Amino acid sequence: MTIYVPKQIVPLSPTLESPLLFLAGPIRGGGDWQADMAEVILNRETSTLIACPSRWNSEHRLATHFHQPFSKADNRQLVWERHYLRQAGLESGVPGCIIFWLGLESTSHPHPGPEPFAMDTRREIGKFTAFAEMMDVRMVVGGNRGFHGLDVILFELSEAFGNPFPFYETMEEVAEHALLVARQ
């Protein structure tokens, strides 16, 4: 498994054996769920490519899997995120999938504000829901059923995809289904 973190954009060539998974979900106030998800994926598929927008440095517990630690670049982090979100979830012929993890706000390290918890995540999932109304989108959604607004999110996804959109409550289920979607 190789983990790509911001901000350097490097060319990736995902394959069926090494699909690209993008970890989308709350960062500030969300805990380190991305590391937990990466470990679940690593335990299933050691050759997976993971794009993770967390600004992990060389001291992180998964640093041995990094292509390189968080690095400065001329581009905004959003440019990095959009690049890999498109590649994982939209580009045809690319084995990839976006994982949206909608967990609850951390009680020990809550979101500092002033904007609401998971604001960027809601924007991103809304954007890819709109894309799904017009094109093929590869994405899987999981998390905690107590995530505020989940019913509306799942309704919108079901409308966009034309059938009831599945929601997974464990990281193991999310990883399993993301790898299946990535290889379709």
Feature names for model-found ranges:
Residues 1-184:
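Conserved catalytic or regulatory cores that recognize and/or transform ribose-phosphate-containing ligands
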